[in-house]
A protein has these predicted regions:
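Hydrophobic/aromatic residues in alpha-helical transmembrane segments
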Residues: 20, 58, 89, 98, ...
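Alpha-helical transmembrane segments and their helix-entry boundary regions
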Residues: 44-48, 101, 115-116, 158-162, ...
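Aromatic-anchored segments of alpha-helical transmembrane domains
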Residues: 56-62, 120-129, 166-175
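Helix-capping/transition residues at the boundaries of transmembrane alpha-helices
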Residues: 63, 103, 107, 152-153
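Function-critical hydrophobic alpha-helical transmembrane segments in multi-pass membrane proteins
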Residues: 74-133
């Protein structure tokens, strides 16, 4: 069963990352690094969910209105909950690696910009094929990673980036069948994208769409402005 096999593989990845995180957090850092930062966790989850949903919704709605995207039915592939659990494990493990212990450790000694460069290089090492999807696809993937770094910096927690990353992956991959996380490509809705490649995204679908690129860029601007405002207020205080 492909769904179970992927769940098992992602479960192993998650277990390894959880052990790595807890080991270094407790044995090396003696719990001095706040990775999860559960204070205001409801707020963190809420910000994360909105950040993950926004680019999908703001891309799908215009495409549906101008009929570049058409709905043609429901795909009853089965094992939906197992696929969702696999996405959950994959996302949590990825966030523990990219914006968990390493992000907090580097951020303790360096500024946000160099830490983001390091995390982006690590992200590229995990996804070496993103440039094969074209310029817009690569830009969307890199901006998505940058948004999550901004989110981690803004909330000082891995919880918000995880929530954003999970809901985005669940919607784009499992619901709309756009983002390719698994070779089997499970999806719930049968959608057809047609017309101008800049809008339809071509083979990359939503992640290859210029509307998605604009949405990701606006999210980056929003969090950069929020961080600047917070820094200004802290200096005044």
């Amino acid at each position: 069963n492909a769904a179970v096999s992927n769940l098992w593989r992602e479960g192993v990845f998650f277990t390894v990352m959880l052990i790595f995180t807890l080991l270094f957090k407790t044995a090396v850092e003696h719990n001095r690094l706040k990775i999860f930062n559960t204070a205001n966790k409801f707020r963190h989850y809420s910000i994360g969910l909105i950040t993950g949903i926004a680019p999908i919704v703001l891309t799908v709605l215009p495409l549906f209105i101008i009929r570049t995207l058409r709905f043609s039915g429901i795909n009853r592939s089965g094992n939906t909950l197992i696929w969702l659990a696999a996405i959950f494990m994959n996302t949590l493990a990825t966030e523990l690696l990219l914006r968990g212990y390493l992000f907090r450790l580097y951020r303790k000694y360096y500024g946000f910009a160099p830490v983001t460069v390091i995390i982006t290089l690590l992200f590229l090492s995990m996804n070496p094929g993103i440039f094969k999807g074209g310029i817009i696809y690569a830009a969307n993937m890199l901006l998505g990673n940058f948004v999550l770094c901004l989110l981690a910096e803004y909330t000082r927690s891995v919880l918000a980036p995880f929530a954003a990353h999970f809901v985005y992956n669940a919607l784009s991959s499992l619901v709309f069948g756009s983002l390719s996380l698994f070779d089997e490509k499970p999806y719930l809705l049968k959608l057809t994208l047609s017309g101008n490649r800049l809008l339809s995204g071509g083979d990359m679908k939503l992640e290859g769409c210029i509307i998605m690129l604009i949405c990701q860029s606006l999210l980056c601007v929003f969090f950069i402005l929020r961080l600047k405002k917070r820094g200004h207020n802290m200096r005044r205080a």
